[in-house]
C-alpha cells in the first residue's frame, strides 16, 4: 500500500492568536516593559503606553506618530480636553477590546472616543444612549448626537421625538429652532392623529414669539399637509387666522388645499409634492382600487378590491350593485369612483354609478345624455369628461348634471383619454382607418384640435394612457413597451419596458408611480401580476399580485381611511381637550358637494 505524498505546504491558523497577542501586550503594559510614550491627560495625570498599540487602535494616534509632527518623536504627549478617567477607559480598550459603558460615562466617553477616533467605542456609547432616551432628554440627546456626528443616536432620537411629539411639554416644543421644527413637520413619521395637530404645533411655535417668528410662518405652513386638514377646520381656523389672511403665500397654500378637497387639483399631473401625501399615523392611505373585469373562465366580476401599498394587503370594498356588462369606463373624481355606460351585448347603458369612499357605498347619479360603450373618461379641473367617437359630454358632481360638448373633430374608434396641463387628450385610430392620431380639447373654447406631435410610435391599437408629473405615458396593449410624450416640450421618449405584457390589463397612477395589473402575459396565460414603474429610478418592479388573475378590469387610486399606523410605544399628538379646534370624529376627506361649496 502506497503512502500518500508528503504535503509541500500545511496551512495553519491559530484562532486564539489575536486574543493571546492582546493579553501579551496587556501584560507588558502592566509590567511597564517596552513602553515608549507617555500620554498626559487633563489635570496632569500620566498614562504610559506603547506607540504601536495606540497607532493600531486609533487613526488619531497613527497620524500623530507616523507623521512629521513633534509628537512623533516626543516621549511625552499632552492631550488637551480629555478627562483622565476617559483616557484610561480608551487605553484599556486598546489593550483588551473591552469597555464598560454606563450612565455615568456614556456621554464623556463618546466625546473622548470621537476626539481620539475610537469609532467602535463611540458606536457602543451611542447604542447605550439610545436605550436611555426619554421625554426629558430626547431633544438634548438629538443635539448632542448631531454635534458629534453620531448618526445612529441622532436617528433614534428623531424617531423617538416624532413618535412622542404629543407628550413633549409646551416649553420643550416652543424652544425648538426653526430648522428642527421644519424637519419634524416635513417627516412622514410625525405621529399625529389628524393633520390639524401638525398645524397647531406650527402655530403654537410662532405664537411663542410672534415678532421674531412670524416671518417664518409661510415656511412652516408649507410643511403642514393642509389638503388633509378637514374642510370645517380650514374655514373656521386656518382661513380665519390673521397670520394666514395677511400672507399671500399662505393664501395660495390654503387655495391649493381647498382645490384638492373639491377635486379641482390633479395631484398626478403635478410634480411630486409631500403635501399631497397623508401621514401614516392619520390612518389615511392612497390605495389602488380594482373594479370589475373577468376571471379565467371569462365570467364577469362584480367585486371591488383595494390594495394598500403601505401594507401590501388587499381588502374587499362594497360590491358593484348591478350588472356591469362590458365596454364601461372607470375614473376617479376626487375621492370617489365613477363607472359610466357599457352594455349587456344588446342594449347600451347611459347609467352612471358613484362609489362614495367615505361610506363604502355605491349610488346611482344622473345618467349620461347619451348611452354609450367603449368610451373613455377622464377628469379635468374637477369635472368628469366622457369621450366617444361621435360625442363628448361633461359631468359636474356639484350639481349632479351633464352638459353636451363639441364632439371630436375627427371621430376615433376605441380611444383612450388623459388630462394634462389643463387640456384633455384623446388617442386612437381614425374611424374606419388604421391611422393613429392625438386630439386635444380646450375647455376654455370648447374646441378640439389635431395635435401635431411628429411621428407617433407604431401602435397597433390605442394604448392605455395616464398622466404623471406633466408627462403622458402610453402603455401598449400588445407589447411591454411604454412611450412618453411631453406636451410642453413636444418631445417623445421611451422608458424601460415592463417585465411582461398586460394584454387587457389595467393602468393607474398611485403614489407617484405607474401601476399596471393583470391581463394576458407573454405566454397568453391570464396574469395576476401587479408591477409598478418609478420615474425616479426609471425601473419596473413587481409589487404584488391580484386576488385572482383578471382582465378587462378598471383601476384607479383614491384616499381611504384605515387603522392609523402609530409606531409601537407612541401615543401621538394629544390635542387640548378643552379646545374645540378638532373633534374626535371620523377623519375623512370631504366627499359631498355640499361639503365642498
UniProtKB/Swiss-Prot annotation:
InterPro entries: BACK, BTB-kelch_protein, BTB/POZ_dom, BTB/POZ_KLHL21, Kelch-typ_b-propeller, Kelch_1, KLHL21_BACK, SKP1/BTB/POZ_sf. Disulfide bonds: none annotated. Pathway: Protein modification; protein ubiquitination. GO terms for cellular component: Cul3-RING ubiquitin ligase complex; cytoplasm; polar microtubule. Coiled coil: none annotated. GO terms for molecular function: cullin family protein binding; ubiquitin-protein transferase activity. Pfam families: BACK, BTB, Kelch_1, Kelch_6. Residues 138-239 form the BACK domain. Keywords: Cell cycle, Cell division, Cytoplasm, Cytoskeleton, Kelch repeat, Mitosis, Repeat, Ubl conjugation pathway. GO terms for biological process: cell division; chromosome passenger complex localization to spindle midzone; protein ubiquitination; regulation of cytokinesis. Kelch repeats lie at residues 287-335, 336-382, 384-422, 423-470, 472-512, 513-560. Substrate-specific adapter of a BCR (BTB-CUL3-RBX1) E3 ubiquitin-protein ligase complex required for efficient chromosome alignment and cytokinesis. The BCR(KLHL21) E3 ubiquitin ligase complex regulates localization of the chromosomal passenger complex (CPC) from chromosomes to the spindle midzone in anaphase and mediates the ubiquitination of AURKB. Ubiquitination of AURKB by BCR(KLHL21) E3 ubiquitin ligase complex may not lead to its degradation by the proteasome. Component of the BCR(KLHL21) E3 ubiquitin ligase complex, at least composed of CUL3, KLHL21 and RBX1. PANTHER family: KELCH PROTEIN (PTHR24412), KELCH-LIKE PROTEIN 21 (PTHR24412:SF255). This is Kelch-like protein 21. It comes from Mus musculus. The gene is Klhl21.
Amino acid at each position: 500500500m502506497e503512502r500518500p505524498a508528503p504535503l509541500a505546504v500545511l496551512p495553519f491558523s491559530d484562532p486564539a492568536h489575536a486574543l493571546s497577542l492582546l493579553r501579551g501586550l496587556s501584560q507588558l503594559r502592566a509590567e511597564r516593559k517596552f513602553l515608549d510614550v507617555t500620554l498626559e491627560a487633563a489635570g496632569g495625570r500620566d498614562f504610559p503606553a506603547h506607540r504601536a498599540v495606540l497607532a493600531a487602535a486609533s487613526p488619531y494616534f497613527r497620524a500623530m506618530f507616523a507623521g512629521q509632527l513633534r509628537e512623533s518623536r516626543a516621549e511625552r504627549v499632552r492631550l488637551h480636553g480629555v478627562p483622565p478617567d476617559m483616557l484610561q477607559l480608551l487605553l484599556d480598550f486598546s489593550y483588551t477590546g473591552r469597555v464598560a459603558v454606563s450612565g455615568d460615562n456614556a456621554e464623556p466617553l463618546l466625546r473622548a472616543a470621537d476626539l481620539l477616533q475610537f469609532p467602535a467605542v463611540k458606536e457602543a456609547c451611542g447604542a447605550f444612549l439610545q436605550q436611555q432616551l426619554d421625554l426629558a432628554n430626547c431633544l438634548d440627546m438629538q443635539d448632542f448626537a448631531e454635534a458629534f456626528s453620531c448618526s445612529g443616536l441622532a436617528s433614534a432620537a428623531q424617531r423617538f421625538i416624532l413618535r412622542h411629539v404629543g407628550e413633549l411639554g409646551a416649553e420643550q416644543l416652543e424652544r425648538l429652532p426653526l430648522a428642527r421644527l421644519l424637519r419634524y413637520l416635513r417627516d412622514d413619521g410625525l405621529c399625529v392623529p389628524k393633520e390639524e395637530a401638525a398645524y397647531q404645533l406650527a402655530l403654537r411655535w410662532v405664537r411663542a414669539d410672534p415678532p421674531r417668528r412670524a416671518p417664518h410662518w409661510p415656511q412652516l405652513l408649507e410643511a403642514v399637509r393642509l389638503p388633509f386638514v378637514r374642510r370645517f377646520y380650514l374655514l373656521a381656523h386656518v382661513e380665519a387666522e390673521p397670520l394666514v389672511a395677511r400672507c399671500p403665500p399662505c393664501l395660495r397654500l390654503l387655495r391649493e388645499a381647498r382645490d384638492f378637497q373639491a377635486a379641482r387639483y390633479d395631484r398626478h399631473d403635478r410634480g411630486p409634492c409631500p403635501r399631497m401625501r397623508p401621514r401614516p399615523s392619520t390612518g389615511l392611505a392612497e390605495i389602488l382600487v380594482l373594479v370589475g373585469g373577468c376571471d379565467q373562465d371569462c365570467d364577469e366580476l362584480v367585486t371591488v378590491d383595494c390594495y394598500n401599498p403601505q401594507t401590501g394587503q388587499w381588502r374587499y370594498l362594497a360590491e358593484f350593485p348591478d350588472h356591469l356588462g362590458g365596454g364601461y369606463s372607470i375614473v376617479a373624481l376626487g375621492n370617489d369612483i365613477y363607472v359610466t355606460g357599457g352594455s349587456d351585448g344588446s342594449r347600451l347603458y347611459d347609467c352612471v354609478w358613484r362609489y362614495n369612499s367615505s361610506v363604502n357605498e355605491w349610488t346611482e347619479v344622473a345618467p349620461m345624455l347619451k348611452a354609450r360603450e367603449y368610451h373613455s373618461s377622464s377628469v379635468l379641473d374637477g369635472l368628469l369628461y366622457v369621450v366617444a367617437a361621435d360625442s363628448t359630454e361633461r359631468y359636474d358632481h356639484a350639481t349632479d348634471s351633464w352638459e353636451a360638448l363639441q364632439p371630436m373633430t375627427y371621430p376615433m374608434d376605441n380611444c383612450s383619454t388623459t388630462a394634462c396641463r389643463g387640456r384633455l387628450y384623446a388617442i386612437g385610430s381614425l374611424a374606419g382607418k388604421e391611422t393613429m392620431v392625438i386630439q386635444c380639447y380646450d375647455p376654455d373654447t370648447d374646441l378640439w384640435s389635431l395635435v401635431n406631435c411628429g411621428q407617433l410610435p407604431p401602435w397597433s391599437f390605442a394604448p392605455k394612457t395616464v398622466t404623471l408629473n406633466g408627462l403622458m405615458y402610453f402603455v401598449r396593449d400588445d407589447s411591454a413597451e411604454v412611450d412618453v410624450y411631453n406636451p410642453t416640450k413636444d418631445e417623445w421618449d421611451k422608458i424601460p419596458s415592463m417585465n411582461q405584457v398586460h394584454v387587457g390589463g389595467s393602468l393607474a397612477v398611485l403614489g407617484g408611480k405607474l401601476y399596471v395589473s393583470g391581463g394576458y402575459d407573454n405566454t397568453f396565460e391570464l396574469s395576476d401580476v401587479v408591477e409598478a414603474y418609478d420615474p425616479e429610478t426609471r425601473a419596473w418592479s413587481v409589487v404584488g399580485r391580484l386576488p385572482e388573475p383578471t382582465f378587462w378590469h378598471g383601476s384607479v387610486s383614491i384616499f381611504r381611511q384605515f387603522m392609523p399606523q402609530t409606531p409601537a410605544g407612541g401615543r401621538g399628538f394629544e390635542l387640548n381637550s378643552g379646545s374645540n379646534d378638532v373633534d374626535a370624529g371620523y377623519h375623512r376627506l370631504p366627499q359631498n358637494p355640499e361639503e365642498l361649496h
